[in-house]
Amino acid sequence: MQLKELPLNALQFYATSSYPCSYLPGQQARSQVAAPSHLVNGVIYAELVRQGFRRSGLFTYRPYCDGCCACTPVRVLVAEFQPDRSQRRAWSRHSTLQARVLKPSFVQEHYDLYLRYQNTRHAGGGMDHDSVDQYTQFLLQSRVNSRLIEFRETLADGEPGPLKLVSILDVLDDGLSAVYTFYEPESSGSLGTYGVLWQIAEAKKLGLAYVYLGFWIKDSQKMNYKTRFRPLEFLVSGNWRADYPSMPASQLS
Protein backbone atom coordinates (compact mmCIF):
# COMPACT_ATOMS: atom_id res chain seq x y z
CA MET A 1 0.00 0.00 0.00
CA GLN A 2 1.39 3.38 -1.00
CA LEU A 3 1.28 6.46 1.21
CA LYS A 4 -1.32 8.15 -1.00
CA GLU A 5 -3.65 5.16 -0.51
CA LEU A 6 -3.64 5.30 3.28
CA PRO A 7 -6.72 6.56 5.17
CA LEU A 8 -4.96 9.80 6.03
CA ASN A 9 -7.35 12.41 4.67
CA ALA A 10 -7.12 14.42 7.86
CA LEU A 11 -3.32 14.31 8.02
CA GLN A 12 -0.77 16.60 6.47
CA PHE A 13 2.93 15.98 5.97
CA TYR A 14 5.42 18.79 6.34
CA ALA A 15 9.19 19.01 6.01
CA THR A 16 11.28 20.34 8.86
CA SER A 17 14.09 22.82 8.40
CA SER A 18 17.55 21.33 7.99
CA TYR A 19 19.63 20.24 10.99
CA PRO A 20 23.01 18.49 11.43
CA CYS A 21 22.81 14.80 10.61
CA SER A 22 23.38 12.56 13.63
CA TYR A 23 24.94 9.77 11.58
CA LEU A 24 26.91 11.21 8.66
CA PRO A 25 29.43 13.91 9.68
CA GLY A 26 29.16 17.15 7.77
CA GLN A 27 25.75 16.30 6.34
CA GLN A 28 22.49 18.19 6.83
CA ALA A 29 19.24 16.31 7.42
CA ARG A 30 15.53 17.04 7.22
CA SER A 31 12.48 15.05 8.28
CA GLN A 32 8.95 14.63 6.98
CA VAL A 33 6.48 14.77 9.89
CA ALA A 34 2.87 13.57 10.04
CA ALA A 35 0.53 16.17 11.57
CA PRO A 36 -1.54 16.72 13.59
CA SER A 37 0.08 14.08 15.75
CA HIS A 38 -3.03 13.30 17.81
CA LEU A 39 -4.70 11.79 14.72
CA VAL A 40 -1.96 9.18 14.28
CA ASN A 41 -3.65 6.22 15.97
CA GLY A 42 -2.36 2.66 16.15
CA VAL A 43 -3.82 1.56 12.82
CA ILE A 44 -2.49 4.53 10.87
CA TYR A 45 0.84 4.37 12.67
CA ALA A 46 1.35 0.72 11.68
CA GLU A 47 0.77 1.62 8.03
CA LEU A 48 3.17 4.55 8.31
CA VAL A 49 5.86 2.30 9.79
CA ARG A 50 5.50 0.03 6.76
CA GLN A 51 6.14 3.13 4.64
CA GLY A 52 9.36 3.94 6.48
CA PHE A 53 8.16 6.24 9.27
CA ARG A 54 9.40 6.13 12.86
CA ARG A 55 8.21 7.56 16.14
CA SER A 56 9.92 9.90 18.59
CA GLY A 57 7.51 10.62 21.40
CA LEU A 58 4.36 12.03 19.82
CA PHE A 59 6.07 12.80 16.51
CA THR A 60 5.89 10.39 13.57
CA TYR A 61 8.53 11.10 10.94
CA ARG A 62 10.80 9.75 8.24
CA PRO A 63 13.97 11.13 6.62
CA TYR A 64 13.32 13.74 3.93
CA CYS A 65 16.81 14.94 3.12
CA ASP A 66 17.91 16.98 0.14
CA GLY A 67 19.96 14.85 -2.23
CA CYS A 68 20.42 11.98 0.22
CA CYS A 69 18.54 8.72 0.76
CA ALA A 70 21.09 6.93 2.94
CA CYS A 71 18.62 6.13 5.74
CA THR A 72 17.04 2.79 4.84
CA PRO A 73 14.27 1.28 7.01
CA VAL A 74 14.98 -2.37 7.87
CA ARG A 75 13.00 -5.20 9.44
CA VAL A 76 13.83 -8.73 10.61
CA LEU A 77 11.80 -11.66 9.28
CA VAL A 78 10.89 -13.29 12.58
CA ALA A 79 9.86 -16.77 11.39
CA GLU A 80 13.05 -17.26 9.38
CA PHE A 81 15.52 -15.71 11.83
CA GLN A 82 18.48 -17.86 12.84
CA PRO A 83 20.96 -16.43 15.37
CA ASP A 84 24.65 -16.61 14.56
CA ARG A 85 27.24 -17.91 16.99
CA SER A 86 27.92 -14.59 18.72
CA GLN A 87 24.19 -13.94 19.08
CA ARG A 88 23.70 -17.37 20.65
CA ARG A 89 26.47 -16.54 23.11
CA ALA A 90 24.83 -13.22 23.99
CA TRP A 91 21.48 -14.94 24.51
CA SER A 92 23.03 -17.58 26.75
CA ARG A 93 25.11 -15.07 28.71
CA HIS A 94 22.06 -13.04 29.67
CA SER A 95 19.54 -15.86 29.94
CA THR A 96 19.04 -15.23 33.66
CA LEU A 97 17.80 -11.66 33.14
CA GLN A 98 14.20 -11.15 34.22
CA ALA A 99 12.07 -9.17 31.76
CA ARG A 100 9.07 -7.19 32.95
CA VAL A 101 6.68 -5.63 30.42
CA LEU A 102 5.28 -2.29 31.60
CA LYS A 103 3.35 0.66 30.29
CA PRO A 104 5.72 3.58 29.62
CA SER A 105 5.96 5.75 32.73
CA PHE A 106 8.69 7.69 34.49
CA VAL A 107 10.90 5.73 36.87
CA GLN A 108 13.92 7.49 38.34
CA GLU A 109 16.04 4.35 38.10
CA HIS A 110 15.34 4.12 34.36
CA TYR A 111 16.25 7.77 33.85
CA ASP A 112 19.50 7.37 35.79
CA LEU A 113 20.46 4.40 33.60
CA TYR A 114 19.56 6.39 30.48
CA LEU A 115 21.93 9.21 31.49
CA ARG A 116 24.76 6.78 32.29
CA TYR A 117 24.27 5.14 28.90
CA GLN A 118 24.23 8.45 27.01
CA ASN A 119 27.26 9.85 28.83
CA THR A 120 29.30 6.70 28.23
CA ARG A 121 28.20 5.54 24.78
CA HIS A 122 27.12 8.81 23.17
CA ALA A 123 28.98 11.56 25.02
CA GLY A 124 28.65 14.89 23.24
CA GLY A 125 25.82 13.61 21.09
CA GLY A 126 23.28 16.06 22.46
CA MET A 127 21.28 13.57 24.52
CA ASP A 128 23.79 13.12 27.32
CA HIS A 129 22.29 16.04 29.24
CA ASP A 130 18.60 15.36 28.60
CA SER A 131 16.33 16.70 31.32
CA VAL A 132 13.50 14.65 32.80
CA ASP A 133 11.08 16.46 30.49
CA GLN A 134 13.20 15.73 27.40
CA TYR A 135 13.54 12.07 28.38
CA THR A 136 9.80 11.81 28.99
CA GLN A 137 8.89 13.47 25.69
CA PHE A 138 11.34 11.29 23.76
CA LEU A 139 10.56 7.87 25.20
CA LEU A 140 7.47 7.85 27.39
CA GLN A 141 4.88 9.90 25.52
CA SER A 142 2.90 7.79 23.06
CA ARG A 143 -0.55 7.56 21.51
CA VAL A 144 -0.03 4.06 20.15
CA ASN A 145 0.36 0.62 21.73
CA SER A 146 3.74 1.06 23.38
CA ARG A 147 5.56 -1.01 25.97
CA LEU A 148 8.54 -0.44 28.25
CA ILE A 149 10.49 -3.59 29.04
CA GLU A 150 12.95 -3.57 31.91
CA PHE A 151 15.52 -6.32 32.34
CA ARG A 152 17.02 -7.08 35.75
CA GLU A 153 19.61 -9.47 37.07
CA THR A 154 18.28 -12.42 39.05
CA LEU A 155 19.43 -12.54 42.66
CA ALA A 156 20.39 -15.73 44.48
CA ASP A 157 16.91 -15.96 45.99
CA GLY A 158 15.29 -15.65 42.57
CA GLU A 159 14.10 -12.10 43.09
CA PRO A 160 14.82 -9.34 40.52
CA GLY A 161 17.97 -7.36 41.24
CA PRO A 162 19.91 -4.54 39.57
CA LEU A 163 18.50 -2.93 36.44
CA LYS A 164 20.56 -3.77 33.34
CA LEU A 165 18.55 -2.91 30.23
CA VAL A 166 15.46 -0.95 29.17
CA SER A 167 13.71 -1.18 25.80
CA ILE A 168 10.83 0.88 24.44
CA LEU A 169 8.86 -0.77 21.65
CA ASP A 170 5.58 -0.35 19.80
CA VAL A 171 3.22 -3.25 19.11
CA LEU A 172 1.93 -3.17 15.51
CA ASP A 173 -0.52 -5.44 13.72
CA ASP A 174 2.33 -7.19 11.90
CA GLY A 175 5.30 -6.78 14.19
CA LEU A 176 7.19 -4.98 16.91
CA SER A 177 8.84 -1.64 16.22
CA ALA A 178 11.98 -0.98 18.26
CA VAL A 179 11.86 2.64 19.44
CA TYR A 180 14.94 2.84 21.66
CA THR A 181 17.10 0.68 23.92
CA PHE A 182 19.59 1.68 26.58
CA TYR A 183 21.57 -0.44 29.00
CA GLU A 184 24.23 -0.51 31.69
CA PRO A 185 27.26 0.79 29.76
CA GLU A 186 29.85 -0.94 31.92
CA SER A 187 28.32 -4.39 31.43
CA SER A 188 30.00 -6.83 29.08
CA GLY A 189 28.38 -9.41 26.87
CA SER A 190 26.41 -7.57 24.18
CA LEU A 191 23.37 -6.39 26.12
CA GLY A 192 22.19 -4.47 23.07
CA THR A 193 22.28 -7.65 20.99
CA TYR A 194 20.36 -9.48 23.69
CA GLY A 195 17.69 -6.77 23.64
CA VAL A 196 17.07 -7.26 19.91
CA LEU A 197 17.05 -11.05 20.31
CA TRP A 198 14.44 -10.74 23.05
CA GLN A 199 12.25 -8.61 20.78
CA ILE A 200 12.52 -11.20 18.00
CA ALA A 201 11.58 -13.97 20.44
CA GLU A 202 8.69 -11.90 21.79
CA ALA A 203 7.39 -11.17 18.29
CA LYS A 204 7.50 -14.89 17.49
CA LYS A 205 5.58 -15.67 20.68
CA LEU A 206 2.94 -13.09 19.72
CA GLY A 207 2.64 -14.49 16.20
CA LEU A 208 4.01 -11.33 14.57
CA ALA A 209 5.96 -11.40 11.33
CA TYR A 210 8.53 -8.62 11.78
CA VAL A 211 10.73 -6.66 14.12
CA TYR A 212 11.28 -3.18 12.69
CA LEU A 213 14.76 -1.96 13.63
CA GLY A 214 14.47 1.59 12.36
CA PHE A 215 16.96 3.04 9.91
CA TRP A 216 20.16 1.49 8.62
CA ILE A 217 22.90 3.52 6.91
CA LYS A 218 25.48 1.63 4.89
CA ASP A 219 28.27 4.08 5.74
CA SER A 220 27.46 4.38 9.45
CA GLN A 221 29.66 2.13 11.59
CA LYS A 222 27.30 2.36 14.56
CA MET A 223 24.48 0.82 12.49
CA ASN A 224 26.40 -2.17 11.14
CA TYR A 225 25.03 -4.42 13.89
CA LYS A 226 21.57 -4.38 12.31
CA THR A 227 22.69 -6.40 9.28
CA ARG A 228 23.66 -9.27 11.60
CA PHE A 229 20.01 -10.05 12.32
CA ARG A 230 19.17 -12.12 9.25
CA PRO A 231 17.18 -12.44 7.12
CA LEU A 232 16.69 -8.69 6.90
CA GLU A 233 14.45 -6.73 4.55
CA PHE A 234 15.21 -3.22 3.27
CA LEU A 235 12.66 -0.60 2.23
CA VAL A 236 14.00 0.69 -1.10
CA SER A 237 11.95 2.96 -3.40
CA GLY A 238 8.78 2.11 -1.51
CA ASN A 239 9.19 -1.67 -1.66
CA TRP A 240 10.49 -4.14 0.93
CA ARG A 241 13.22 -6.30 -0.59
CA ALA A 242 15.67 -8.92 0.60
CA ASP A 243 18.78 -7.10 -0.60
CA TYR A 244 20.19 -3.62 -0.80
CA PRO A 245 21.64 -2.13 -4.01
CA SER A 246 25.44 -2.47 -4.13
CA MET A 247 25.52 -4.08 -0.69
CA PRO A 248 28.34 -6.65 -0.33
CA ALA A 249 27.05 -10.22 -0.37
CA SER A 250 28.94 -10.90 2.87
CA GLN A 251 26.56 -8.54 4.69
CA LEU A 252 23.42 -10.28 3.46
CA SER A 253 21.96 -13.69 4.20
Curated annotation (Swiss-Prot):
Catalytic activity, reaction form: N-terminal L-glutamyl-[protein] + L-leucyl-tRNA(Leu) = N-terminal L-leucyl-L-glutamyl-[protein] + tRNA(Leu) + H(+); N-terminal L-aspartyl-[protein] + L-leucyl-tRNA(Leu) = N-terminal L-leucyl-L-aspartyl-[protein] + tRNA(Leu) + H(+)
Top-level taxon of the source organism: Bacteria
GO biological process, one term: ubiquitin-dependent protein catabolic process via the N-end rule pathway
SUPFAM superfamilies assigned: Acyl-CoA N-acyltransferases (Nat)
Principal EC category: transferase
Function description: Functions in the N-end rule pathway of protein degradation where it conjugates Leu from its aminoacyl-tRNA to the N-termini of proteins containing an N-terminal aspartate or glutamate.
Protein name, UniProt field: Aspartate/glutamate leucyltransferase
Organism: Albidiferax ferrireducens (strain ATCC BAA-621 / DSM 15236 / T118)
Organism lineage: Bacteria, Pseudomonadati, Pseudomonadota, Betaproteobacteria, Burkholderiales
Gene designation: bpt
